[in-house]
Amino acid sequence: MDSSTWSPKTTAVTRPVETHELIRNAADISIIVIYFVVVMAVGLWAMFSTNRGTVGGFFLAGRSMVWWPIGASLFASNIGSGHFVGLAGTGAASGIAIGGFEWNALVLVVVLGWLFVPIYIKAGVVTMPEYLRKRFGGQRIQVYLSLLSLLLYIFTKISADIFSGAIFINLALGLNLYLAIFLLLAITALYTITGGLAAVIYTDTLQTVIMLVGSLILTGFAFHEVGGYDAFMEKYMKAIPTIVSDGNTTFQEKCYTPRADSFHIFRDPLTGDLPWPGFIFGMSILTLWYWCTDQVIVQRCLSAKNMSHVKGGCILCGYLKLMPMFIMVMPGMISRILYTEKIACVVPSECEKYCGTKVGCTNIAYPTLVVELMPNGLRGLMLSVMLASLMSSLTSIFNSASTLFTMDIYAKVRKRASEKELMIAGRLFILVLIGISIAWVPIVQSAQSGQLFDYIQSITSYLGPPIAAVFLLAIFWKRVNEPGAFWGLILGLLIGISRMITEFAYGTGSCMEPSNCPTIICGVHYLYFAIILFAISFITIVVISLLTKPIPDVHLYRLCWSLRNSKEERIDLDAEEENIQEGPKETIEIETQVPEKKKGIFRRAYDLFCGLEQHGAPKMTEEEEKAMKMKMTDTSEKPLWRTVLNVNGIILVTVAVFCHAYFA
């Protein structure tokens, strides 16, 4: 069946002028305005009701969060606009398999809450590189990991989210891509710079609700339009564009016909676009890196009131992660059915006409569905949903990136920095991050056949596995030491960067114009590459650790799984260095007790807005400090809640197995 008969509006979005008029109505605009007012109100409320004047308050929300905002924030930080654009786009191009990536996380959030976070809390750390410094000693691993994490944020998270959010705004409002980016970032940076982690978590919770309500409504509209689930399965396989040749060039059938295995998540190990061994093992390695060792995710868990709230948040997030298959991937596939000529275009000149890039237009599958299918008012709601997902991800990343920079890099360079100076440095760093990310957007636009999600996963496959190997061994094998971990990371990085640079130099190509990259380098699927890279890093770490001196247990109490319950006092490997750093801070605290000059009204307003006001709280006694430290590193739970949460964890893993089996 010729799918162009599906909707009289099939080509309505080709000219920005028409789309600009689509969203120029009172209902849409008022919903968007209400959305921004509510978000700013929640951000301001969090800003003035929480303590942001200390590093712990700004970066860890004062360890006071309960389970439901943590679960919502974990989900919202993970689901950016890159997911709406990327998952729906890859779904439109190749079927449901990409949704299985999301289900992989159901098992890993349980691993995070039950195995990894207890160790991080007992270690008493704020950042992941800080944990590695306590575990291995020395500074080189900490600085290396901080820099690599910041690079990963720029290459995968920030630039991909900015790009996908801008695609959506460009399609809905007709705004220039870069103007759209500028507006988004201005608002996002404003409440991250001023509000700290509490503002981020509360706005994330609000945005999760908006995101789920909006996308469920759109999913209902989409399935109604296409005639239900059975009709959707049948029509997707027939969604083939009519223009498949350009002059004398006729494109191969595989470039524009839906895959025969579109409705299976486990695909052929050799010819599949997402081969099943890579899907199970390679994806699990990437998911382990992201969910169990990434600053953005772990920071939310560390802000929890106690261990039960951590586990509750992880379980809530796990159930929410069931949704993207149905609210993002399948609507993307329906978009291909309804607007086949545009979404499934294969001729470069046609694609450029529809979406401004020659490699394919699947990235606009979800935005097109919103702009074309939703009635007035609801269209504004969906634009708010996209903005919500974009801004919640960006605020999370900005807050975590500034934490990494401030605590792991800046504090090393400026050992005598006061608390106030650290706060200002963290906020200024966010502005630098934004500039670099915008510069990377054009590269994201053309990578991986124009499929955003494949681009994100491939970069992660080249840089993430060595980090996963180090954390896994650091926590579960006490024999691993600093030289082993460091050289494992360095070798893994060199191999990963070689593949990444080669792929960018040759271009990833597309079905119509394959890349000239040598098969020995680019021919290995990125998920298989992740397995190989993980294995090389793992073996390197183990071998070098066995050939070098072990770390005495006295330095490892409560830093690895086998010693997690030890009561002895730990002598930190970095204790001497910490004493040097802490010395000047005491003198600074003494200095601040000197009577200050009264500040002017503008200066007081500025300090209040940025959370830099100094509260004259009395200094804690040594006993109080000890009690506070005990509370901050306590992982005990009430027996009833531990049982309830364990049962829920088992149910969640069972649901994950069922979903994989049902759609296999």
Curated annotation (Swiss-Prot):
Q: Name the consequence of T287 to S/A.
A: Has normal D-glucose and D-galactose transporter activity
* Residues under site feature: Involved in sugar-binding/transport and inhibitor binding: T460
Q: What is the effect of changing N248Q?
A: Loss of N-glycosylation
**GO MF terms on file?**
alpha-glucoside transmembrane transporter activity; D-glucose transmembrane transporter activity; D-glucose:sodium symporter activity; fucose transmembrane transporter activity; galactose transmembrane transporter activity; galactose:sodium symporter activity; myo-inositol:sodium symporter activity; pentose transmembrane transporter activity
Task: Give the Extracellular compartment stretches of this protein.
Answer: 1-24, 91-95, 170-176, 222-275, 332-375, 445-451, 505-525, 663-664
Q: In which tissues is it expressed?
A: Expressed in intestine. Expressed in endometrial cells.
Q: Which residues are glycosylated?
A: N248
Membrane topology is:
Multi-pass membrane protein
What does changing S396A do? Answer: Loss of activity
Alphabetized, the UniProt keywords read: Cell membrane, Disease variant, Disulfide bond, Glycoprotein, Ion transport, Membrane, Phosphoprotein, Sodium, Sodium transport, Sugar transport, Symport, Transmembrane, Transmembrane helix, Transport
Give the catalysed reaction(s), semicolon-separated.
Answer: D-glucose(out) + 2 Na(+)(out) = D-glucose(in) + 2 Na(+)(in); D-galactose(out) + 2 Na(+)(out) = D-galactose(in) + 2 Na(+)(in)
Q: How is it modified after translation?
A: N-glycosylation is not necessary for the cotransporter function.
- Pull one GO CC term from this UniProt entry: perinuclear region of cytoplasm
Q: What is the effect of changing G426R?
A: In GGM; loss of activity
Query: Could you say which residues bind D-glucose here?
Result: Q457
Q: Where in the cell is it found?
A: Apical cell membrane
Could you list the residue ranges that cross the membrane? 25-47, 67-90, 96-117, 140-169, 177-193, 203-221, 276-295, 310-331, 376-406, 423-444, 452-477, 482-504, 526-547, 645-662
Protein name (record):
Sodium/glucose cotransporter 1
Organism whose genome encodes this protein: Homo sapiens
